[in-house]
Amino acid sequence: MTKKRAERLTGYEIRELPPERGMFTVGAFEGDQLIVKAVGHADFLALRALVHGVYFVHSRKAMEQNGWRCARCRASRHLEIHHRKYRSHGGTHRIENLEPVCRDCHKLIHREERSQ
């Protein structure tokens, strides 16, 4: 996994520490305070698994809330999760930011956004 991808997945800034190869610092802002913690590779993998786990649980909950149907056309096949506000723009994996859509509607959403 690349550093950039890990930062995107976790929402944390990740820097490799020079003295100990394989160690990472993980930092996040809480209010106006920066919390930084050094973690090893195993902890980093656990953090990544936690982020994926949260996404999985919230995705399923969003699907359930919508009756396992596309929020746009109400189809029930080929469902995907659309982030209303992208992670790259500060969006989260919170349920209110997730929208279940079918593959066709998902493509259409992104096509419309690119054309604006």
Predicted regions and their residues:
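Histidine-centered catalytic micro-motifs used for acid/base chemistry in nuclease
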Residues: A71, E80-Y86
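Short, charged surface segments at domain edges that flank catalytic/cofactor-binding sites
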Residues: T2-K3, K37-R69, H89-T92, E96, ...
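Short, cysteine/histidine-rich loop/knuckle motifs that typically chelate Zn2+
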Residues: A71-R72, D104
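Short Cys/His-centered divalent metal-binding micro-motifs
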Residues: H78, L98-Q116
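Short helix-coil boundary/hinge micro-motifs
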Residues: M1-G31, V57-N66, Q116
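Low-complexity, intrinsically disordered short segments enriched for Gly/Pro and polybasic residues
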Residues: L50, H78-I81
